[in-house]
Amino acid sequence: KEKNAVIAKNEQLRADLLRAISHDLRTPLCSISGNADMLLSNSERLDEATKHQIYTDIYDDSEWLIGVVENLLSITRLNDGRLKFKFTDQLLDEVIAESLRHISRKHDDYKIVTDCEELVLARMDVRLIMQVLVNLVDNAIKYTPPGSVICIRGTKTDGKAQISVEDNGPGIPEEMKTHIFEMFYTGKTTVADSHRSLGLGLALCHSIIEAHEGTLVLTDHDPHGCNFTFTLPLSEVTLNE
């Protein structure tokens, strides 16, 4: 029975994955194709501002697809037990700074601030933790209006390294909170860009943090907004301050 349950779960995962890919990846691919066709057939009749916007749209759609592929690869390898972890000791402030260099250019419309304690050394697979941070910040960008403030904090709390991504957006409805870390869950939202999600990012983040023997939780940010907080084990190496 246990073996049959695993097979059924894998079949359901495969079906959900195919459905999500066929439906949600079609939109950016059609956008790229349509914009490229416009440039090829009407380039001489388009002014520079219009061309620049088309180039920007193609770039943004391509970057989104790259992010989706990276998430797909990671989550399938994680589920199959094929994802190899390479744990090293890393400074939180350096990991946060490097992660911000990988955030979508759309963050220019947002105020992203960092507040990190110095010399907090954590044990992590740095590539995967950067993927977690990129996903959490992208999620904050997706569900908050331009001009919002997103704050990334790094601290040492209760014998663990802790990173939080806070936003001052509208927050997440109560009915979504219990499902927010489920794979393929995108919720019912009126956000214009909500179709641009396979519901993989937060599920992947949760799995990666669990593999680090940490926790990832969602809380409300006062007075409004969301606060995603995750913990990592502190390094056993001591830094001389």
Q: Residues of each region from the PLM?
A:
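Short alpha-helical Gxxx[C/S/T] motif in the catalytic ATP-binding
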Residues: 201, 205
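Short helix-loop "hinge" at the ATP-lid/N-box region of the Bergerat-fold HATPase_c
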Residues: 140-141
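Short alpha-helical segment of the dimerization/phosphotransfer core of two-component systems
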Residues: 60-65
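Short conserved segment of the HATPase_c
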Residues: 172-184
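Conserved catalytic submotifs in the C-terminal HATPase_c
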Residues: 86-91, 111-121
